[in-house]
Amino acid sequence: MVAPQFVLRDTEGTVHGPDEWSRAQAIVIFFTTIDCPLSNSYVPEMNRIRQTYSDRGVAFYAVQTDTTIAEAEVRRHARDFAFSFPVLIDPRQSLVQLAGATATPEVAVLSKSGKVLYLGRIDNRIEDFDKRRSVVTESDLRNALDAVLAGRPVPHARTPVVGCGINFLTQEKKP
């Protein structure tokens, strides 16, 4: 299997593609949308996880899943929420399809060849849409990354996600 063969531009205009992805030990995709409060609440934690793992060869990207949101709004959202990693514009939902994501905030860990090694929640903080744990007891994304970087299989390759459903390509893009 080879790295995904498409290129995507981020909100700052930088193009990301196969050459970049093939150099990573693992690729984390954070599926998000600007109007999902659960997804927005996870940006600080995703920034912390990126800070911990990026020096170990893990590449981090967020993907705006709602293709009807204007790019200027996505750019504003990325800046307002202080993402510390690129927010990709994916007009064909290529990464959503590759990973099989269905909700935000959902994360995928991909191998450098594009194989989905983990798909699911970041941790177990969110029990239900309006119910959160005061203490996280399962750090699923961190556990998956630790396993991948150690060359071990991910113990729980799929975990359930509580979040906002992804709107799949059926609507016209807003100006």
Predicted regions and their residues:
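N-terminal "domain-start" segment that seeds a small globular fold
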Residues: 1-19
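Short, thiol/selenol-centered motifs that function as redox-active sites or metal-ligating centers
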Residues: 33-44, 67-68, 107, 164-167
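Short active-site neighborhood of thiol/selenol oxidoreductases, capturing the structured segment around
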Residues: 17-41, 60, 145
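Structural recognition of the beta-strand scaffold that forms the well-ordered cores
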Residues: 29-30, 59-64, 86-89, 109, ...
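Loop/turn elements at helix/coil->beta-strand transitions in domains of secreted/extracellular proteins
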Residues: 24-27, 56-59, 83-85, 104, ...
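Thiol/selenol-based redox catalytic cores and closely related redox-interacting motifs
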Residues: 91-171
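Structural microenvironment flanking redox-active thiols in thiol-disulfide oxidoreductases
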Residues: 40-81, 88-98
